[in-house]
Amino acid sequence: MAALIAENFRFLSLFFKSKDVMIFNGLVALGTVGSQELFSVVAFHCPCSPARNYLYGLAAIGVPALVLFIIGIILNNHTWNLVAECQHRRTKNCSAAPTFLLLSSILGRAAVAPVTWSVISLLRGEAYVCALSEFVDPSSLTAREEHFPSAHATEILARFPCKENPDNLSDFREEVSRRLRYESQLFGWLLIGVVAILVFLTKCLKHYCSPLSYRQEAYWAQYRANEDQLFQRTAEVHSRVLAANNVRRFFGFVALNKDDEELIANFPVEGTQPRPQWNAITGVYLYRENQGLPLYSRLHKWAQGLAGNGAAPDNVEMALLPS
Protein backbone atom coordinates (compact mmCIF):
# COMPACT_ATOMS: atom_id res chain seq x y z
CA MET A 1 0.00 0.00 0.00
CA ALA A 2 2.79 2.41 0.93
CA ALA A 3 4.61 1.59 -2.30
CA LEU A 4 1.45 2.31 -4.30
CA ILE A 5 0.96 5.67 -2.56
CA ALA A 6 4.60 6.58 -3.14
CA GLU A 7 4.29 5.64 -6.81
CA ASN A 8 1.17 7.78 -7.19
CA PHE A 9 2.88 10.76 -5.55
CA ARG A 10 5.86 10.35 -7.86
CA PHE A 11 3.56 10.25 -10.88
CA LEU A 12 1.77 13.42 -9.74
CA SER A 13 5.10 15.13 -9.13
CA LEU A 14 6.32 14.30 -12.63
CA PHE A 15 2.99 15.35 -14.14
CA PHE A 16 2.96 18.73 -12.43
CA LYS A 17 6.63 19.30 -13.25
CA SER A 18 5.93 18.67 -16.93
CA LYS A 19 2.90 20.99 -16.79
CA ASP A 20 4.56 23.76 -14.79
CA VAL A 21 3.69 26.46 -17.35
CA MET A 22 0.03 25.43 -17.44
CA ILE A 23 -0.16 25.32 -13.64
CA PHE A 24 1.57 28.70 -13.33
CA ASN A 25 -0.87 30.25 -15.80
CA GLY A 26 -3.77 28.72 -13.88
CA LEU A 27 -2.52 30.12 -10.58
CA VAL A 28 -2.05 33.54 -12.18
CA ALA A 29 -5.61 33.41 -13.50
CA LEU A 30 -7.03 32.38 -10.11
CA GLY A 31 -5.07 35.13 -8.36
CA THR A 32 -6.36 37.65 -10.88
CA VAL A 33 -9.95 36.51 -10.32
CA GLY A 34 -9.54 36.98 -6.56
CA SER A 35 -7.98 40.41 -7.04
CA GLN A 36 -10.80 41.46 -9.36
CA GLU A 37 -13.44 40.37 -6.85
CA LEU A 38 -11.67 42.29 -4.08
CA PHE A 39 -11.35 45.36 -6.30
CA SER A 40 -15.06 45.27 -7.17
CA VAL A 41 -16.05 45.09 -3.50
CA VAL A 42 -13.55 47.53 -2.01
CA ALA A 43 -12.34 49.98 -4.66
CA PHE A 44 -14.92 50.22 -7.46
CA HIS A 45 -17.26 53.19 -7.01
CA CYS A 46 -18.88 54.58 -10.13
CA PRO A 47 -18.94 58.43 -10.03
CA CYS A 48 -22.42 58.47 -11.64
CA SER A 49 -21.64 61.69 -13.49
CA PRO A 50 -21.78 62.38 -17.23
CA ALA A 51 -18.40 62.06 -18.99
CA ARG A 52 -16.74 60.81 -15.79
CA ASN A 53 -18.57 57.49 -15.95
CA TYR A 54 -17.04 56.61 -19.30
CA LEU A 55 -13.48 57.43 -18.26
CA TYR A 56 -13.82 55.68 -14.91
CA GLY A 57 -15.34 52.55 -16.41
CA LEU A 58 -12.65 52.24 -19.07
CA ALA A 59 -9.93 52.91 -16.49
CA ALA A 60 -11.35 50.25 -14.16
CA ILE A 61 -11.00 47.67 -16.94
CA GLY A 62 -7.94 48.90 -18.82
CA VAL A 63 -5.51 50.31 -16.24
CA PRO A 64 -5.28 47.20 -13.99
CA ALA A 65 -5.00 45.05 -17.12
CA LEU A 66 -2.11 47.21 -18.37
CA VAL A 67 -0.36 47.07 -14.99
CA LEU A 68 -0.74 43.27 -14.84
CA PHE A 69 0.61 43.00 -18.39
CA ILE A 70 3.71 45.04 -17.53
CA ILE A 71 4.27 43.04 -14.34
CA GLY A 72 3.97 39.82 -16.35
CA ILE A 73 6.67 41.00 -18.74
CA ILE A 74 8.95 42.05 -15.88
CA LEU A 75 8.59 38.72 -14.04
CA ASN A 76 9.26 36.62 -17.15
CA ASN A 77 12.85 35.32 -17.23
CA HIS A 78 12.76 35.23 -21.04
CA THR A 79 12.47 39.02 -21.03
CA TRP A 80 15.81 39.47 -19.33
CA ASN A 81 17.39 36.69 -21.38
CA LEU A 82 16.37 38.64 -24.48
CA VAL A 83 17.77 41.85 -22.98
CA ALA A 84 21.05 40.08 -22.19
CA GLU A 85 21.13 38.68 -25.73
CA CYS A 86 20.71 42.14 -27.22
CA GLN A 87 23.33 43.58 -24.89
CA HIS A 88 26.06 40.98 -25.34
CA ARG A 89 25.46 39.42 -28.75
CA ARG A 90 23.22 41.90 -30.59
CA THR A 91 20.94 38.89 -31.44
CA LYS A 92 23.40 37.92 -34.20
CA ASN A 93 22.39 34.26 -33.91
CA CYS A 94 18.63 34.89 -33.82
CA SER A 95 16.73 34.95 -37.08
CA ALA A 96 13.41 36.74 -37.45
CA ALA A 97 11.23 33.66 -36.90
CA PRO A 98 12.77 32.51 -33.56
CA THR A 99 12.84 36.09 -32.30
CA PHE A 100 9.16 36.50 -33.19
CA LEU A 101 8.28 33.24 -31.46
CA LEU A 102 10.22 34.22 -28.35
CA LEU A 103 8.49 37.61 -28.20
CA SER A 104 5.15 35.85 -28.70
CA SER A 105 5.96 33.55 -25.79
CA ILE A 106 6.82 36.51 -23.54
CA LEU A 107 3.73 38.48 -24.52
CA GLY A 108 1.48 35.41 -24.35
CA ARG A 109 2.57 34.56 -20.82
CA ALA A 110 2.24 38.19 -19.75
CA ALA A 111 -1.28 38.39 -21.25
CA VAL A 112 -2.76 35.69 -18.97
CA ALA A 113 -3.49 38.02 -16.05
CA PRO A 114 -4.77 41.04 -18.04
CA VAL A 115 -7.01 38.88 -20.23
CA THR A 116 -8.41 37.21 -17.11
CA TRP A 117 -9.00 40.62 -15.53
CA SER A 118 -10.77 41.90 -18.64
CA VAL A 119 -12.93 38.78 -18.96
CA ILE A 120 -14.03 38.86 -15.31
CA SER A 121 -14.73 42.59 -15.54
CA LEU A 122 -16.90 42.06 -18.62
CA LEU A 123 -18.73 39.07 -17.13
CA ARG A 124 -19.51 41.02 -13.96
CA GLY A 125 -20.62 43.99 -16.05
CA GLU A 126 -20.33 46.67 -13.38
CA ALA A 127 -17.60 48.70 -15.10
CA TYR A 128 -19.30 48.34 -18.50
CA VAL A 129 -22.65 49.53 -17.10
CA CYS A 130 -20.93 52.46 -15.40
CA ALA A 131 -19.08 53.47 -18.57
CA LEU A 132 -21.95 53.27 -21.07
CA SER A 133 -25.16 53.93 -19.13
CA GLU A 134 -25.25 57.59 -20.22
CA PHE A 135 -24.99 56.61 -23.91
CA VAL A 136 -28.17 54.51 -23.99
CA ASP A 137 -30.73 55.95 -26.40
CA PRO A 138 -33.57 57.30 -24.21
CA SER A 139 -36.12 56.87 -27.01
CA SER A 140 -35.51 53.10 -26.97
CA LEU A 141 -36.55 52.79 -23.32
CA THR A 142 -40.11 51.92 -22.39
CA ALA A 143 -41.57 50.70 -19.12
CA ARG A 144 -45.26 50.02 -18.46
CA GLU A 145 -46.12 51.80 -21.70
CA GLU A 146 -44.35 54.93 -20.46
CA HIS A 147 -41.51 56.63 -22.29
CA PHE A 148 -38.31 57.80 -20.70
CA PRO A 149 -38.38 61.53 -19.82
CA SER A 150 -36.33 63.43 -22.37
CA ALA A 151 -35.40 66.31 -20.06
CA HIS A 152 -31.88 65.87 -18.64
CA ALA A 153 -31.79 62.32 -20.01
CA THR A 154 -27.99 62.08 -19.99
CA GLU A 155 -27.71 63.14 -16.34
CA ILE A 156 -30.46 60.75 -15.29
CA LEU A 157 -28.95 57.81 -17.19
CA ALA A 158 -25.50 58.54 -15.76
CA ARG A 159 -26.90 58.13 -12.23
CA PHE A 160 -28.51 54.76 -12.92
CA PRO A 161 -25.45 52.69 -11.79
CA CYS A 162 -25.71 54.29 -8.32
CA LYS A 163 -29.45 53.57 -8.01
CA GLU A 164 -30.10 57.13 -6.86
CA ASN A 165 -33.05 57.86 -9.16
CA PRO A 166 -36.70 58.32 -8.21
CA ASP A 167 -38.78 55.19 -7.75
CA ASN A 168 -40.81 55.90 -10.89
CA LEU A 169 -37.62 55.35 -12.94
CA SER A 170 -36.68 52.03 -11.34
CA ASP A 171 -38.10 50.04 -14.26
CA PHE A 172 -36.03 52.07 -16.72
CA ARG A 173 -32.97 51.55 -14.55
CA GLU A 174 -33.48 47.77 -14.56
CA GLU A 175 -33.90 47.76 -18.33
CA VAL A 176 -30.71 49.77 -18.88
CA SER A 177 -28.76 47.57 -16.47
CA ARG A 178 -30.09 44.37 -18.07
CA ARG A 179 -29.30 45.59 -21.59
CA LEU A 180 -25.75 46.71 -20.78
CA ARG A 181 -24.96 43.60 -18.74
CA TYR A 182 -26.09 41.50 -21.69
CA GLU A 183 -23.69 43.37 -23.98
CA SER A 184 -20.86 43.20 -21.44
CA GLN A 185 -21.21 39.46 -20.86
CA LEU A 186 -21.52 38.83 -24.59
CA PHE A 187 -18.19 40.59 -25.16
CA GLY A 188 -16.69 38.63 -22.27
CA TRP A 189 -17.72 35.26 -23.71
CA LEU A 190 -16.55 36.31 -27.18
CA LEU A 191 -13.17 37.25 -25.70
CA ILE A 192 -12.93 33.84 -24.03
CA GLY A 193 -13.73 32.13 -27.33
CA VAL A 194 -11.18 34.17 -29.29
CA VAL A 195 -8.45 33.51 -26.73
CA ALA A 196 -9.23 29.78 -26.66
CA ILE A 197 -9.02 29.56 -30.46
CA LEU A 198 -5.73 31.49 -30.51
CA VAL A 199 -4.21 29.25 -27.83
CA PHE A 200 -5.32 26.12 -29.70
CA LEU A 201 -3.93 27.35 -33.03
CA THR A 202 -0.67 28.43 -31.40
CA LYS A 203 -0.17 25.02 -29.76
CA CYS A 204 -0.94 23.23 -33.03
CA LEU A 205 1.44 25.47 -34.98
CA LYS A 206 4.20 25.03 -32.40
CA HIS A 207 4.06 21.23 -32.48
CA TYR A 208 3.62 21.13 -36.26
CA CYS A 209 6.66 23.33 -36.91
CA SER A 210 8.85 21.71 -34.27
CA PRO A 211 11.45 19.25 -35.65
CA LEU A 212 11.49 17.46 -32.29
CA SER A 213 9.28 14.59 -31.29
CA TYR A 214 6.78 15.08 -28.50
CA ARG A 215 8.85 12.93 -26.12
CA GLN A 216 12.06 14.85 -26.82
CA GLU A 217 10.26 18.16 -26.27
CA ALA A 218 8.97 16.82 -22.94
CA TYR A 219 12.51 15.70 -22.02
CA TRP A 220 13.87 19.12 -23.00
CA ALA A 221 11.29 20.85 -20.78
CA GLN A 222 12.16 18.55 -17.86
CA TYR A 223 15.88 19.17 -18.40
CA ARG A 224 15.41 22.95 -18.37
CA ALA A 225 13.33 22.78 -15.20
CA ASN A 226 15.84 20.51 -13.43
CA GLU A 227 18.83 22.54 -14.58
CA ASP A 228 17.27 25.79 -13.39
CA GLN A 229 16.32 24.29 -10.03
CA LEU A 230 19.76 22.78 -9.44
CA PHE A 231 21.53 25.93 -10.65
CA GLN A 232 19.56 28.17 -8.29
CA ARG A 233 20.11 25.82 -5.35
CA THR A 234 23.83 25.47 -6.08
CA ALA A 235 24.26 29.21 -6.63
CA GLU A 236 22.70 29.89 -3.25
CA VAL A 237 25.06 27.44 -1.52
CA HIS A 238 28.09 28.73 -3.46
CA SER A 239 27.35 32.36 -2.61
CA ARG A 240 26.80 31.50 1.06
CA VAL A 241 30.06 29.56 1.37
CA LEU A 242 31.96 32.27 -0.52
CA ALA A 243 30.50 34.94 1.76
CA ALA A 244 31.50 32.90 4.84
CA ASN A 245 35.07 32.54 3.55
CA ASN A 246 35.38 36.27 2.88
CA VAL A 247 33.95 37.18 6.29
CA ARG A 248 36.44 34.80 7.92
CA ARG A 249 39.33 36.44 6.07
CA PHE A 250 38.20 39.88 7.23
CA PHE A 251 37.43 39.16 10.89
CA GLY A 252 39.57 36.08 11.41
CA PHE A 253 36.48 34.03 12.25
CA VAL A 254 32.88 33.64 11.14
CA ALA A 255 29.79 32.88 13.25
CA LEU A 256 28.20 29.80 11.70
CA ASN A 257 25.29 27.64 12.69
CA LYS A 258 25.41 23.88 12.34
CA ASP A 259 23.92 23.88 8.84
CA ASP A 260 26.44 26.45 7.62
CA GLU A 261 29.32 24.44 9.07
CA GLU A 262 28.13 21.38 7.19
CA LEU A 263 27.85 23.39 3.97
CA ILE A 264 31.39 24.72 4.25
CA ALA A 265 32.75 21.28 5.12
CA ASN A 266 30.94 19.52 2.27
CA PHE A 267 31.22 22.20 -0.44
CA PRO A 268 34.56 24.01 -0.36
CA VAL A 269 34.65 27.05 -2.64
CA GLU A 270 38.03 27.98 -4.11
CA GLY A 271 37.09 30.91 -6.35
CA THR A 272 34.46 32.62 -8.45
CA GLN A 273 33.43 32.38 -12.08
CA PRO A 274 34.70 35.13 -14.40
CA ARG A 275 32.25 37.40 -16.20
CA PRO A 276 32.73 35.77 -19.66
CA GLN A 277 31.48 32.47 -18.23
CA TRP A 278 28.36 34.14 -16.84
CA ASN A 279 27.77 35.84 -20.18
CA ALA A 280 28.21 32.52 -21.98
CA ILE A 281 25.38 30.86 -20.04
CA THR A 282 23.04 33.88 -20.08
CA GLY A 283 20.74 34.95 -22.89
CA VAL A 284 18.26 33.62 -25.42
CA TYR A 285 18.78 29.97 -26.21
CA LEU A 286 17.66 28.11 -29.31
CA TYR A 287 17.65 24.36 -29.52
CA ARG A 288 20.92 23.41 -31.20
CA GLU A 289 22.70 20.31 -32.33
CA ASN A 290 26.44 19.81 -32.61
CA GLN A 291 27.58 16.86 -34.69
CA GLY A 292 24.12 15.36 -34.38
CA LEU A 293 23.98 15.58 -30.57
CA PRO A 294 21.47 17.91 -28.87
CA LEU A 295 22.51 20.84 -26.72
CA TYR A 296 19.62 21.63 -24.38
CA SER A 297 20.79 24.93 -22.87
CA ARG A 298 23.56 27.49 -22.85
CA LEU A 299 24.98 25.80 -19.75
CA HIS A 300 24.94 22.45 -21.57
CA LYS A 301 26.67 24.11 -24.52
CA TRP A 302 29.31 25.67 -22.25
CA ALA A 303 29.87 22.38 -20.40
CA GLN A 304 30.59 20.67 -23.73
CA GLY A 305 33.33 23.20 -24.43
CA LEU A 306 31.43 24.92 -27.25
CA ALA A 307 30.93 28.36 -25.72
CA GLY A 308 33.17 30.88 -24.10
CA ASN A 309 36.47 29.18 -24.91
CA GLY A 310 36.73 29.37 -28.67
CA ALA A 311 36.48 25.59 -29.15
CA ALA A 312 33.86 25.93 -31.88
CA PRO A 313 32.03 28.85 -33.46
CA ASP A 314 28.32 29.29 -32.96
CA ASN A 315 27.56 28.71 -36.63
CA VAL A 316 28.70 25.08 -36.34
CA GLU A 317 25.40 24.42 -34.59
CA MET A 318 21.89 24.27 -35.98
CA ALA A 319 19.24 26.56 -34.52
CA LEU A 320 15.84 24.88 -34.65
CA LEU A 321 13.35 26.56 -32.33
CA PRO A 322 13.25 28.73 -29.26
CA SER A 323 12.98 27.27 -25.81
Curated annotation (Swiss-Prot):
Placenta. It comes from Homo sapiens (Human). Belongs to the CALHM family. It is a multi-pass membrane protein. GO terms for cellular component: plasma membrane. It is found in: Cell membrane. It catalyses: ATP(in) = ATP(out). Disulfide bonds join C46-C130, C48-C162. The chain crosses the membrane at residues 22-43, 53-76, 102-132, 180-206. Coiled coil: none annotated. Keywords: Cell membrane, Disulfide bond, Ion channel, Ion transport, Membrane, Transmembrane, Transmembrane helix, Transport. Residues 214-251 are annotated as: Intersubunit interaction. This is Calcium homeostasis modulator protein 2. Pore-forming subunit of Ca(2+) homeostasis modulator channels. Mediates ATP release from astrocytes and ATP-induced Ca(2+) influx in microglia thus regulating neuronal ATP and Ca(2+) homeostasis, synaptic transmission and neuroinflammatory response. May form intercellular gap junctions. The gating mechanism remains unknown.
